[in-house]
């Protein structure tokens, strides 16, 4: 269970890195912010890619499980950064995504 919590926390940090790496260019392109924001955006996306390599599972399984956490972090971003309160549909969808992540992450592992 401790490993599951560690992986979930790592997914959370990974999602924040990805969202920041995409949000900063969005600010440049849609809000007219300084192009210098592209520098930390690129660094954040590089950190995101590196963080994905820290997971012990196969890449495809890691990406699949990560997706569930990403959805929840994006909803938290919606609420805390964009100032939009998630709807009950958002929350139910996020819970379903987390359940999917847990099913993938907690599946029995074959003995090597």
Swiss-Prot record:
It is found in: Cell inner membrane. Its main location: membrane. The chain crosses the membrane at residues 9-29, 34-54, 65-85, 91-111. Keywords: Cell inner membrane, Cell membrane, Membrane, Transmembrane, Transmembrane helix. Pfam families: UPF0060 (PF02694). SUPFAM superfamilies: Multidrug resistance efflux transporter EmrE (SSF103481). One of its GO terms (cellular component) is plasma membrane. It is a multi-pass membrane protein. InterPro entries: UPF0060. PANTHER family: UPF0060 MEMBRANE PROTEIN YNFA. HAMAP family: UPF0060. NCBIfam families: PRK02237.1. Belongs to the UPF0060 family. This is UPF0060 membrane protein Mpe_A1656. It comes from Methylibium petroleiphilum (strain ATCC BAA-1232 / LMG 22953 / PM1). The lineage of its organism: Bacteria, Pseudomonadati, Pseudomonadota, Betaproteobacteria, Burkholderiales.
